[in-house]
């Protein structure tokens, strides 16, 4: 029994993990609580049910990071990507799927494998023996959520995302912005320049507040009734409490001197903080929001220095369950306190169907290799897979860790290439060319 691989959760990650492990010759049991235990979002008991969008986003594997992830998954015999191709809908350069036939097909393919069994039952604890992958997604059941909290510590499991927008560093206008921590705090130069600052005049601030209050906003979905808590109040809710609230909160202008205009005191300052070790991504501090995406880009580009901002991720607050993976998981997604257990998918802090399935693919292969007594080299960081797993298991800042889509800001720079907009096409092609070579080389281990 201990040589079976148990996978809890039959979503994108769990289905992909099962497929990969089964094709390596390992016996797999998928534990899926639906339809016996329902969620507010799912409609069926099918595996890999898509409950939100039906899009896997861009399929461009030369100029887009998620398209590159598609390519890497296809190269690894991905169940999710193969089945998506079979049920593809017209969507321009994106990969959209007919969601019901897609889920039915994934379910049928897994059930047809002689070494895969689906057990429709809820798992409510973290076993101490056997090989397990927990891929329970953003709607992890309350009982299992409590078990994970007990094992990991309550402060390391979040039930609502407080997602601030993330901006590509190269798109920020540094002729208006500058690097400085408040009151120059810090022992090192890096600490004293940890924040990127965008100043506002009084007129700019008032116009920003007007736009913020008037912007289209989304409401909590049914089942997301816990409301807001002060630790992650949306900026528009803060603005509704008073026009000066933001100026005395995340946008307070104190302890900062604008080197571009040293004699002029800003009325308000928007701060951005480095979001990855490479310094290619910055998050807008305190700017979690329920504004609709189109409104976010319009409003946030009113910030001086961000007029041409390119966003790696837009903000939001919604129901989720995810670990502080940089603290809790090792480089193979094993729980450090219980290494017989791996986590995969959205619960690890990746965002999106494709990213979830990708982490399932890795977890399934890693768990199967462990069962078979096979050593694997680390996933190459220059691949999309490697950039993503490196981010969630150590590359991200643990104190501010939030779910992340795959994007080129997670990739190590390619030396000798132009920065900025003009060099972007060549730079992205260099990223994808390098990634494909690295990924194909890693696959030779199987």
UniProtKB/Swiss-Prot annotation:
Q: Which cofactor does it need?
A: FAD
Which Gene3D superfamilies does the record associate with it?
A: FAD/NAD(P)-binding domain
Which InterPro entries does this entry report, sorted A to Z?
A: FAD/NAD-bd_sf (IPR036188), MnmG-rel (IPR002218), MnmG-rel_CS (IPR020595), MnmG_N (IPR040131), TrmFO (IPR004417)
Q: Which organism is it from?
A: Ruegeria sp. (strain TM1040)
Assigned EC number: 2.1.1.74
* Function description: Catalyzes the folate-dependent formation of 5-methyl-uridine at position 54 (M-5-U54) in all tRNAs.
Record's family? Answer: Belongs to the MnmG family. TrmFO subfamily.
Positions binding FAD in this chain are: 9-14
Q: Where are the transmembrane segments?
A: none
**Organism's domain of life?**
Bacteria
One GO biological process from the UniProt record? tRNA wobble uridine modification
Q: Which SUPFAM superfamilies match?
A: FAD/NAD(P)-binding domain
UniProt keyword terms in alphabetical order: Cytoplasm, FAD, Flavoprotein, Methyltransferase, NAD, NADP, Transferase, tRNA processing
Q: Does the keyword Methyltransferase apply?
A: yes
Catalysis: reaction(s): uridine(54) in tRNA + (6R)-5,10-methylene-5,6,7,8-tetrahydrofolate + NADH + H(+) = 5-methyluridine(54) in tRNA + (6S)-5,6,7,8-tetrahydrofolate + NAD(+); uridine(54) in tRNA + (6R)-5,10-methylene-5,6,7,8-tetrahydrofolate + NADPH + H(+) = 5-methyluridine(54) in tRNA + (6S)-5,6,7,8-tetrahydrofolate + NADP(+)
- This chain is encoded by the gene named trmFO
Please identify the protein, giving its name as recorded: Methylenetetrahydrofolate--tRNA-(uracil-5-)-methyltransferase TrmFO
Report the GO terms under cellular component. cytosol
């Amino acid at each position: 029994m201990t040589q079976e691989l148990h996978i809890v959760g039959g979503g994108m990650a769990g289905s992909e993990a099962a497929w990969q492990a089964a094709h390596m010759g390992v016996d797999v049991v998928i534990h899926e609580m639906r339809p016996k235990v329902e969620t507010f979002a799912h409609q069926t008991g099918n595996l890999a049910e898509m409950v939100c969008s039906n899009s896997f986003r861009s399929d461009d594997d030369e100029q887009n990071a998620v398209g590159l992830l598609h390519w890497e998954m296809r190269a690894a015999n991905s169940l999710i990507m193969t089945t998506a191709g079979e049920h593809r809908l017209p969507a321009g350069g994106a990969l959209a799927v007919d969601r019901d036939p897609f889920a039915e097909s994934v379910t049928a393919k897994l059930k047809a494998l002689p070494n895969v069994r689906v057990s429709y039952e809820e798992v409510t604890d973290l076993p101490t023996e056997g090989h397990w992958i927990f891929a329970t997604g953003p709607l992890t059941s309350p009982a299992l959520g409590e078990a994970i909290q007990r094992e990991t510590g309550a402060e390391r499991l979040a039930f609502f995302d407080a997602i601030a927008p993330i901006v590509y560093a190269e798109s920020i206008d540094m002729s208006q912005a500058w690097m400085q921590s408040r009151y120059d705090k810090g022992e090192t130069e890096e600490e004293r320049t940890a924040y990127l600052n965008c100043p506002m005049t009084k007129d700019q601030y008032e116009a920003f507040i007007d736009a913020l209050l008037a912007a289209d906003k989304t409401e909590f979905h049914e089942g997301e009734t816990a409301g807001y808590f002060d630790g992650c109040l949306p900026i528009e809710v803060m603005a509704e409490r008073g026009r000066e609230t933001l100026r005395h909160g995340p946008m307070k202008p104190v302890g900062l001197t604008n080197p571009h205009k040293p004699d002029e005191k800003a009325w308000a300052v928007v701060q951005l903080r480095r979001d990855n070790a490479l310094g290619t991504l910055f998050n807008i501090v305190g700017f979690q929001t329920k504004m609709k995406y189109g409104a976010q880009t319009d409003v946030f580009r009113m910030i001086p220095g961000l007029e041409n901002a390119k966003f790696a991720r837009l903000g939001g607050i919604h129901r989720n369950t995810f670990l502080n993976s940089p603290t809790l998981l090792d480089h193979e997604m094993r729980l450090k306190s219980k290494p017989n257990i791996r986590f995969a998918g959205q619960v690890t802090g990746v965002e999106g169907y494709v990213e979830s399935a990708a982490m399932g693919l890795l977890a399934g292969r890693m768990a199967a290799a462990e069962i078979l007594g096979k050593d694997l080299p680390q996933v190459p960081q220059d691949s999309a897979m490697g950039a993503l797993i490196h981010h969630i298991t150590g590359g991200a800042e643990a104190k501010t860790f939030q779910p992340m889509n795959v994007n080129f800001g997670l990739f190590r720079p390619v030396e000798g290439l132009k920065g900025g907009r003009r060099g972007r096409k060549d730079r992205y092609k260099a990223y994808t060319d390098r990634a494909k070579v690295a990924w194909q080389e890693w696959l030779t281990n199987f």
